[in-house]
């Protein structure tokens, strides 16, 4: 009885993070990875739910299912945050152009564009950057060191075309295809 509840609980701890990541992969357009995760998810789901449905009078199993689901959601969110899949667009609004800041961001590999914008009371400087999500905190830390009062907003772009990032992605893709062709030739 307790063993079944433990199996259900631990199955949920595996199932729900996979469910979370699969959903994110689908949203990000990573269909093949999402499909592979979906197959694994399906097997775990059927096993855990099968045990619960085998004895609906066993409240321990139902509690283990619900508790595992809740904790699994938390674990899935933590894993997703650590993986930081995808890209983020970051806008920075500062009182005036700060060339040392721009130079530092570029030295660190960030693609930064700057422009003058009309604020409520004055002309201000806006910095725009699209970067990998796993570098967002690094970007914000650098900006905060140079401009502690900066207004920073970030969001996930639905899609993008051209620019510094797509050139780099294209180069990585070409390297991958060359490497794959060499492996296939052997």
Swiss-Prot record:
Compartment(s) where it occurs, according to its Swiss-Prot or TrEMBL record: Cell membrane
Record-linked InterPro entries: DUF5698, UPF0316
One Gene Ontology CC term in the entry: plasma membrane
Per UniProt, the keywords (alphabetical) are:
Cell membrane, Membrane, Transmembrane, Transmembrane helix
Q: What stretches pass through the bilayer?
A: 1-21, 34-54, 59-79
Q: Which CDD domains match?
A: YitT_C_like_1
Q: Name one Pfam family in it.
A: DUF5698
What's the chief localization of this chain? membrane
Question: Where does the signal sequence lie?
Answer: none
Q: Give the bilayer topology.
A: Multi-pass membrane protein
UniProt family annotation:
Belongs to the UPF0316 family.
Tell me which HAMAP family the record gives: UPF0316 (MF_01515)
Protein's UniProt name: UPF0316 protein ABC1774
- The record lists the organism as Shouchella clausii (strain KSM-K16)
Identify the taxonomic lineage of the organism of origin. Bacteria, Bacillati, Bacillota, Bacilli, Bacillales
């Amino acid at each position: 009885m307790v063993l079944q509840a433990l199996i259900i609980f631990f199955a949920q701890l595996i199932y729900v993070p996979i469910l979370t990541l699969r959903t994110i992969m689908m949203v990000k357009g990573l269909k093949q990875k999402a499909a592979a995760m979906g197959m694994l998810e399906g097997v775990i789901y059927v096993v855990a739910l099968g045990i619960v449905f085998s004895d609906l009078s066993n409240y321990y199993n139902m509690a283990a299912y619900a508790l595992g689901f809740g904790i699994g959601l938390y674990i899935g969110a933590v894993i997703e945050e650590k993986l930081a899949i995808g890209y983020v667009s970051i806008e920075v609004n500062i009182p005036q152009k700060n060339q040392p800041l721009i130079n530092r961001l570029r030295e660190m590999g960030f693609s930064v564009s700057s422009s003058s914008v009309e604020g409520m009371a004055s002309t201000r400087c806006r910095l725009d950057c699209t970067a990998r999500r796993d570098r967002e905190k690094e970007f914000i830390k650098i900006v905060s060191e140079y401009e502690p009062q900066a207004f920073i907003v970030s969001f996930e772009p639905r899609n993008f075309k051209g620019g510094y990032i797509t050139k780099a992605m294209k180069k990585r893709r070409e390297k991958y295809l060359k490497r794959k062709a060499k492996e296939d030739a052997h």
